[in-house]
Amino acid sequence: MQHCVRASAGATAHHAVGTYRCRLPLLAGPCQRTALPWAHTKLPAAHRTRCRVDCRSTQGPAAAPSLSDSDNEPSSTSGWRPPRPPPPPQGPSPLRQLYKRTLKQLSNLKLALAELAVIAALSAVGTVIKQGETYEFYMENYPEEGRKVLGFLTGRIVVALQLDHIYTAEYFLLLLALLGASLTACTITNQWPAVKVARRWRFKGEQASLARLEVASRVPDARLVDVGRVLAAKNYQVFMKDGQLYGFKGLAGKLGPIGVHASMLLCMAGFVTGALGGFTGSVMIPQGSETVVASALRSASPLAWNPGGASAVIRCDDFRIDYREDGSVRQFYSDLTVLDVDGREQSTKTVSVNQPLRFGGVTAYQTDWSMSALKVKVAGSFVAPEDTAFQLPMAALNGGDSKLYATFLPAEDPALAPPGTAPRGVSMLARDLQTVTFYDSKGEFAGVRRLGSGKPIEVEGMTIVAQEVLAATGLELKADPGVPLVYAGFGGLCVTTVVSYLSHSQVWAAQAGSGVIVGGTSNRAKVAFEQELSDMLGEVPEVLQQAPDLVDGNGKADSSNGSSSGGNSSSSSSSGSKDSKEQVL
Amino acid sequence: MMVNIPVIENFLSNSCFLILFLTTVYYWLKIGFGGKSSFSFTGLTGYGSALCCLTLQLILRWVDSGHFPLSNLYESLIFLAWCLLLLYIYIEVSTKTLFLGVLTSPAILCLVAFTDFSLPTELQQSTPLVPALQSNWLVMHVTVMIASYAALLLGCFIAIAYLVLSKFFIKTTFVTAPLSSQNTVLRQESFLEEKQKTDIVFEKNDKNLKFLFFLDNLSYRTIGIGFCFLTLGILSGAIWANETWGNYWSWDPKETWAFITWLTFACYLHSRLVGGWTGSKPALVASFGFLVVWVCYLGVNLLGQGLHSYGFLNV
């Protein structure tokens, strides 16, 4: 079966000229339809004003339209204007006028694109200039004299323009707020009305308006109800009235973009809530010790409200590192117990890097660790000659990327050493929880021992056995009330982004004599829509008129596709054959 | 039976390179010497076998290391090449065009060559995962991000091809019909508004312009898919970061550049959907976006510091 469903090129020629804004090559203007008494004739006021608002969806030729397709502005080249409404008796109040004007400015597309571009540029600056460093760092790396970075960028400019903490600078936050305002304005002025429009279906009765649709064709010898039936079988929602038909499918594809913007606003609300209402802090809890959560939390702003878990106490029962054979870390494990104010145990959990502990609105993440003390057994120390157990506190050594902790065991009584000199002793260094390295008083390397092996080492006249490192677990504590909002926004964004790619297809039809004129439009996947419509119209059964002398007429018309399969069936007057012929308008 | 996995992997990567090289040569010869230019079965076989080599290589690495093969730069580059090949095969089969192969096969060849021959050997080893990466989110976040890079890079590449070819073709059009230049402009616009055709032969000017329209539309659709994946990737990364460190956004260079990429393509899509732009103007935005994606994917890792860095170039 040959079907020729051709895009209306006639409309194209009209609309190639003119500003890009009013170029609606392939849509019928709504104004055309007001000629018919039973069609919706009244354009709501919002549509008229929207003709002049930039942030609305025009249908570009290769682009997906429109949240409010086919309903808004009259084409500038059609030569037909809707009758101007009479001026209102009294203007709206100045406040309302100001509100409307502000909304219009904010929902300007060019403004929104400019905002996105500036935010992107400033974010990029923040990745080039290292953030959050000390004043000296910028003085050193962006010098005042000599070769200045980029010829003009000195440390003073960096700090003065807040480029060292650009993401929390006021102008950056204001820009983000402006973007949020633009999103809100766009949703109010354009997208929300589109939802209301979507609920109102509009018929097109005039042949010319149907012909002007993106995809249009005439099905001879068919009935409107059959067209409707075929559409319904393809999951279209079909409405029929007085010889006219309207069907649509995939309304979600039209509402998707609105959902995207609404989800983004929800995310922004969550960000603000978290930024203002959250608590954060980090704490090192040595094995066996405990700490009150509230002492570690710092509020983000005066508006923050205390989470319930702030009064709890966390105790670290154990901290261990799981090492692989090659010495790299497989995982960190902390056994934590949460106690309430009175010391009763609330919960216990083994926390690791991707498994945090949640209690009372506070979450504890395993992010760090340190060594707090080294347990050794020493024979021959200045304290006592026999085996004595020491627990030596360790300190972190700076420099290099990896952790290094050290402690010192004096070989002689420090009080007896001459003032101003350091006593002789043994330095013990550890990088991880597996081995300890020993150095003597002169700083010479003395040996390495595995923790827990029990092997002694002789340094500076003492016999030392390194038994165990007491580690401390580093926990990041966070209470963020905005997270539910942010997650809800994220979830909405995931769903609505995907949904926005669905095609919103609309089909109009009207009975014209013995045949039906069908036209349609789709906001995405136009080629597939054309194919689909073509296939659907192929399934519309042929209905012949009763007069027998029309058999010849049909026989003649049959030659267009030559498929009179069952020439006898064409003489019946009921909806017989499934063949259908179409003519190109 | 002890299987020497590194040897097999080496064999697979070399054969993948060889197959892609032969496929590139084949496409160029086929286009250069004319012939019917709908999709090419031989070319697709070449692509398909390269895809199989890469799939096997990834599976072997998975078996060898015990974790999902997407933990370092080398594996992510292989996965990117894999996604590009898959995407290209789908496009060629569904749109039945040959010409794209001429453009994309050398690009994928360069990518695979860089991955296998330029990357230092120590970066190619599969290393065990650090604790922060031991999570199921690794599979979701990284695959979606790499897939989005593949779609965006392909779409932007097509847009660049559009720009280059449109300069070339429009010159030709003007040369052949200088007196009717006004008509030519209108004709070009009206052709851009017609639906795509599938013949791509360069002798006739009409066909050239239809092909330009096809490129324009294809780049738009590919970038659209890429943008969708990019959104999902960024969101899954944020949720993962919140589960691991309690902070869904820390303005890490990689996060920031992913956000910048997202903003760039949001501009592109809005200029098309809402502003109604077609043709050269969005293609320029897409060309800029091409650079942005590369900076986001490789530039940040190689140059910067932060949670995502490999940092083997010290700047």
Curated annotation (Swiss-Prot), chain B:
Subunit details: May interact with Ccs1.
GO cellular component: chloroplast thylakoid membrane; plasma membrane
Organism: Chlorella vulgaris (Green alga)
HAMAP family the record matches: CytC_CcsA (MF_01391)
GO biological process, one term: cytochrome complex assembly
Subcellular location, record wording: Plastid, Chloroplast thylakoid membrane
Transmembrane helix found in the keyword field: yes
Entry's family note: Belongs to the CcmF/CycK/Ccl1/NrfE/CcsA family.
Keyword line: Chloroplast, Cytochrome c-type biogenesis, Membrane, Plastid, Thylakoid, Transmembrane, Transmembrane helix
InterPro entries named among the record's database cross-references: Cyt_c_assembly, Cyt_c_biogenesis_CcsA, Cyt_c_biogenesis_CcsA/CcmC
Single GO MF descriptor: heme binding
Membrane topology designation: Multi-pass membrane protein
Pfam families recorded: Cytochrom_C_asm (PF01578)
Task performed by this protein: Required during biogenesis of c-type cytochromes (cytochrome c6 and cytochrome f) at the step of heme attachment.
Name this polypeptide is given: Cytochrome c biogenesis protein CcsA
UniProt gene name: ccsA
Transmembrane segments: 15-35, 39-59, 73-93, 97-117, 144-164, 222-242, 257-277, 283-303
